[in-house]
């Protein structure tokens, strides 16, 4: 991988939040769809800071397992005090409570009511970052939401456990 691509991936995965009062949300996702079956997962690590109240910022952790073969979709969410979270300004390194995502690895668990979803996943091998807007807009205030895919076509392996059912990801 070229030095330029490494620098680009590092910068596009670094956190932008700096405690600003105007409100902020910023999310780091991993998601994958099975190539031939109606199966997928989606995991999100998020900073949410309400407008005018950065002291009320929280980390949010979301996970969804989609099983179209059994028409069973399971979702869970938790909110964690921001003091129990960390988001790197230098690279992909986020922690929401005990859940972490760093370049190439994501691990965590959510229990919400009777639902429990946990994961231990490795990922990599994707293409260069895919910017969905012109590059110059990513450092401006508008638009507020700026999506990008930092590793399109990444491959995953590991496991997800949903309510005691272990699913191998390969």
What is each residue range found by the language model?
Residues 1-170:
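Targeting-peptide/extracellular-domain and disordered-appendage signature
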């Amino acid at each position: 991988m070229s030095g330029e691509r490494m620098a680009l991936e590092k910068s596009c995965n670094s956190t932008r939040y700096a405690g600003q009062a105007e409100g902020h949300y910023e999310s780091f996702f991993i998601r994958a769809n099975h190539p031939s079956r109606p199966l997928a997962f989606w995991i999100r690590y998020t900073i949410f800071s309400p407008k005018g109240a950065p002291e009320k910022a929280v980390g949010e952790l979301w996970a969804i397992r989609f099983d179209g073969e059994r028409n069973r979709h399971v979702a869970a969410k938790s909110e964690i005090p921001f003091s129990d979270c960390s988001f790197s300004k230098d690279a992909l390194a986020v922690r929401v409570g005990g859940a972490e995502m760093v370049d190439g690895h994501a691990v965590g668990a959510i229990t919400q009511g009777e639902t429990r979803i946990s994961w231990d996943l490795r990922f990599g091998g994707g293409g260069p970052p895919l910017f969905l807007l012109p590059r110059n807009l990513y450092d401006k205030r508008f638009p507020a939401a700026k999506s990008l895919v930092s590793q399109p076509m990444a491959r995953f392996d590991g496991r997800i456990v949903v309510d005691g059912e272990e699913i191998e990801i390969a």
